[in-house]
Amino acid sequence: GIHTNHGMYSTLYSFPTIMKRNAMKGSVIPVYSGLPTVLKDNGYYNLFFMTHESQYDNMNAFFRTNGFDEIYAEENYPKEKIANHFGVQDDYLYEYAIPILNERAQSGQPFFTVLLSISNHPPYVIPSYFHPKSDKIEDQIVEYADWSIRKFMTEAQKQPWFDNTLFILIGDHGKLVGTPENEMPESYNHVPLMMYGKGITPQAINDFGGQI
């Protein structure tokens, strides 16, 4: 797909994107069987963290109906941390999540968490405390996104739940690059997937795959 709602819908609930429709919107919200609901049925506690306000794309209602126990959004964050209409910046989102995940881990119940970042989406905002090396704003924001993830992973490594956690990094969709040759630019469908966890042997897999 070409929008965040497409990627979230397909990745979490294993349904193909309906290109001209946001499947998460509607007066009646369907209940899907997907990763959050299956994990919940097997004893997991599910959390969702987003940078922006919770009703964007009807996310709050949709995800609460479909397996998530807690949702954290712009309404939960201090006003001084709001950077623009997309809410807080990535590094603060990750920083905010750590103590909440620690609290969940202390309960002894396994948990599944989605952290939906925003930095690599225009309008780009580079925090004053981050000093990029690149000249172009498009490259600077990638540096910032990378730095934010590194900062989160460094802090996560200090937590007791780290060794028993599988981290999955995936994009919601690709980005338009160059001059498209098709009605649906192929670059929109080039989405990276990374898995990181204790005991996983480093390797690159080049097989074709999809979010569903």
Q: Which residues fall in each region the model found?
A:
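Solvent-exposed soluble domains appended to multi-pass membrane proteins
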Residues: 1-212
